[in-house]
Amino acid sequence: MHEMKYREGLTPYKRAKYARQEAALLRRDQESQIPIRYRILESGLPPAAQARALKKYQTLAVLEDPTQFCKLRTWLEGVLRIPFGKHHAAPCKSHRSKIKRLCDTKAAMDRWIYGHAEAKESIVHMVSQTLANPHGTPQSIGIIGPMGNGKTTLVRQGIARALQRPFMQISLGGMSDVTLLKGHAYTYENSSWGRMVDVLMEARCMNPVVYFDELDKVSQSDKGDEIISALIHMTDTSQNTDFRDHFFEDISIDLSRVVFIFSFNNEKAISPVLLDRLYLIRTQALQPADKCVIASSYLLPTVARNIGFAPDQLRLAPAAARFLLSQIPSEKGVRQLKRALEHIVLRLNTMKLLNEACRKRTKKADIGQILGTIQCPAAAKLTHVLHFPLTLTPDLLRQLVHPKPSPSYEFMYT
């Protein structure tokens, strides 16, 4: 009775959401109860892969060695997790729906990231092409720009959101072995499949947006060359319908519908062969005026929300943003600026909790003990006089952090 009454009070959106979740959980439970033989027969595996999996299953039935049995079982379970034939579709049939998708894409990028007008325009063009020909072969993309200037956000909130596909990230920084990407051969002990197959399993579709971060940081060695060769193969439209993971060497995996995106800072460090395959989107270094806007309108609201402040409880005055920039090393992005804001807001959060404790007459000894952990004496004295909502000014920031001893933001962490 209570359940029916609760359901009647739900919005249509929530009812549909709960129905989808329940159906997915029941379907997963049913799949786990279906014998492997029938899961192979009912799977979307290509005929050749299906035949190979059935042969493996027949071998499994007569294996006596428990180690080999477990390994072959893992192989079969892994193959059945690859989402063969499943694609995320975002149909926009009418002209109006396509225009709305483009407008939503631009609005989402503007909401999440400031500036980068040329890069945003390039992304809108790319999305337009996909809307015009949704079954076409997607272009591989290279997004260039300095560290911390918003490349990942552009891809996640721009391209992946516009295409309505899962966003999967693979970090290439320092990667020195192609087996991390393509797996180990089945014959090796404790071998498994590689990260590329992993992201397909996690995305549960064969056309996710796969974002390779720090392409220019791949190891400069023979092993690094093997990684680049694998990436060239994966982005080659004449070959990527037949990708082979080392663990599933007999199974052909079609990567032709995957949207591959690579980010890098140094264009000269990229293999010319791979670079030639990429549609390049360039992002620029952020200017001080841009950083001030980003700090007050983008970074502070995000940091404050993550730490637990209400949206209107903290505001950064323009002069305070300029002061903060003067206290950190010159950078082309905003990573250090974000770290500085995080430290300040964390300190403010502790002071806010102590302020509330004072009003509730918490033991002075307890409050004093926590105040002793705040290493900035001026900040500790502010605890009793801060009131929220609060506007951060240069004078307040000077009291919240230690005086600048050197051209480094590290003073904020002492």
Task: Go through the PLM ranges and name each one.
Residues 132, 136-172, 201-202, 232, ...:
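Walker A/P-loop
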Residues 145-146, 183, 214:
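The Walker A (P-loop) glycine that initiates the GxxxxGKT/S ATP-binding motif of P-loop NTPases
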Residues 203-208, 243-263, 315-316:
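AAA+/SF3 P-loop NTPase mechanochemical coupling elements
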Residues 161-191, 199, 219, 290:
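AAA+/P-loop NTPase substrate/partner-engagement loops
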Residues 1-132, 153:
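Extended, charged alpha-helical coiled-coil/arm scaffolds that mediate oligomerization and mechanical coupling
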Residues 335, 340-414:
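C-terminal engagement/docking regions of AAA+ P-loop ATPases
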Residues 42-49, 204, 266-276, 280-342, ...:
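Conserved C-terminal "switch" segment of AAA+ ATPases
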Residues 212-253, 276:
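Conserved catalytic/switch belt of AAA+ P-loop NTPases
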